[in-house]
Amino acid sequence: MSQRPLDVLNEALNSPVIVRLKGGREFRGELQGYDMHMNLVLDNAEELKENEASRKLGTIIVRGDTVVYVSP
């Protein structure tokens, strides 16, 4: 049986995830929460960039309509 997107997010709570946004930006952090619009709260987040050091951001909120995918 296939899972719904919010079921996957629920299973990923308190676990490390990688989030890719429209425009190609990627963030890695621990998923602390989400809502029905797929707005995400990441703790210990860092922005990942090719050929550059990652930038540590701490706790961030990611707007759901910018999310392309979440990889647990």
Curated annotation (Swiss-Prot):
Sm domain span: 4-72
Keywords linked to the UniProt accession: Ribonucleoprotein
Cellular component terms (Gene Ontology): ribonucleoprotein complex
Superkingdom to which the source organism belongs: Archaea
Pfam families on file: LSM
Positions of transmembrane segments: none
Family: Belongs to the snRNP Sm proteins family.
Name recorded for this polypeptide: Putative snRNP Sm-like protein
